Amino acid sequence: MTEQQPIAVLGGGSFGTAIANLLAENGQAVRQWMRDPEQAEAIRTRRENPRYLKGVKVHPGVDPVTDLERTLADCQLIFVALPSSALRKVLQPHQAALTDKLLVSLTKGIEAHTFKLMSEILEEIAPQARIGVISGPNLAREIAEHELTATVVASEDDELCARVQAALHGRTFRVYASRDRFGVELGGALKNVYAIMAGLAAAMDMGENTRSMLITRALAEMTRFAVKLGANPMTFLGLAGVGDLIVTCSSPKSRNYQVGHALGEGLSLEEAVSRMGETAEGVNTLKVLKEKSDEMQVYMPLVAGLHAILFEGRTLAQVIQLLMRGEPKTDVDFIPTTGF
């Protein structure tokens, strides 16, 4: 189904560009908004996003624009691919223009000073809008290069889910639906932290046993924390949980993995982030997640360990020693350990 109105994608980064391309390939007219006029002009003239998705052709149906007010006025379905640190600042002045719109967040992050997810910020800014999120094992370059990919659109608004599925579903991109918006979005935000740790472990040439342990214990931590906040634990067995965690913790294409790998090579955190040239949400998420887990008294030793390395001056060897000496816990939470 093709939308009668153009569809907006807010954000000129790699993921926003990949989603804009998918929409255009499905016959949609797309307005991709970005703040930088030079970037918009480069995409318009070269049909490529050289800053964030070099070598991938941008579909002719994608119109790069810089007039946000007009874009919001012209479009009903709006995909929001703005960094977590910028989303509120960009959209708050346009609150009135968002009434009755369908807003779908693509950003996997948490606002630093409030611990709010992006969909919660959208609800605050535009309480009359209809809100959804997209999350899953979705590396932007692989989507843009038409590798077979699946994602999850999550909302209690079934019509919104159906419209997003119709707009994005194609020969290489499959869209599943979920009603657990909170769990889907939280999984996408939390796994960024563990991807940094996975990159660090890879740079230190740790064995496959170790990497497998990190990923599975990360899943246990994520789920434990999310359930404490009201999410459905089953969500974390799907694409937005274990699926996203595996790809982000295994692929050098992941921005957060790259930051961790750079740290393992001996770079400082500032140098590692600077090398990226694009937002790695996991660094910001780690700070607020450590504070929130302490406040809620949720057991998250991997989060505490990575925080100690990045912000407390501990070495990886010191943290590993502490982790391995920790009290053994139950392997799988949420399943009774009796009666089997």
UniProtKB/Swiss-Prot annotation:
The keyword tRNA processing does not apply. This is Glycerol-3-phosphate dehydrogenase [NAD(P)+]. One of its GO terms (cellular component) is cytosol. The lineage of its organism: Bacteria, Pseudomonadati, Pseudomonadota, Gammaproteobacteria, Pseudomonadales. NCBIfam families: PRK00094.1-2, PRK00094.1-4, PRK00094.2-4. NADPH binds at S14, F15, R35, K108, A140, R255, E281. Keywords: Cytoplasm, Lipid biosynthesis, Lipid metabolism, NAD, NADP, Nucleotide-binding, Oxidoreductase, Phospholipid biosynthesis, Phospholipid metabolism. Pathway: Membrane lipid metabolism; glycerophospholipid metabolism. It is found in: Cytoplasm. GO terms for molecular function: glycerol-3-phosphate dehydrogenase [NAD(P)+] activity; NAD binding. PANTHER family: GLYCEROL-3-PHOSPHATE DEHYDROGENASE, GLYCEROL-3-PHOSPHATE DEHYDROGENASE [NAD(+)] 2, CHLOROPLASTIC. It is an enzyme of class 1 (oxidoreductase). GO terms for biological process: carbohydrate metabolic process; glycerol-3-phosphate biosynthetic process; glycerol-3-phosphate catabolic process; glycerol-3-phosphate metabolic process; glycerophospholipid biosynthetic process. The keyword Protein transport does not apply. Pfam families: NAD_Gly3P_dh_C, NAD_Gly3P_dh_N. It comes from Pseudomonas aeruginosa (strain ATCC 15692 / DSM 22644 / CIP 104116 / JCM 14847 / LMG 12228 / 1C / PRS 101 / PAO1). The active site is at K191 (proton acceptor). InterPro entries: 6-PGluconate_DH-like_C_sf, 6PGD_dom2, G3P_DH_NAD-dep, G3P_DH_NAD-dep_C, G3P_DH_NAD-dep_N, NAD(P)-bd_dom_sf. Its main location: cytoplasm. Belongs to the NAD-dependent glycerol-3-phosphate dehydrogenase family. It catalyses: sn-glycerol 3-phosphate + NAD(+) = dihydroxyacetone phosphate + NADH + H(+); sn-glycerol 3-phosphate + NADP(+) = dihydroxyacetone phosphate + NADPH + H(+). Sn-glycerol 3-phosphate binds at K108, G136, K191, D244, S254, R255, N256. Its EC number is 1.1.1.94. Catalyzes the reduction of the glycolytic intermediate dihydroxyacetone phosphate (DHAP) to sn-glycerol 3-phosphate (G3P), the key precursor for phospholipid synthesis.
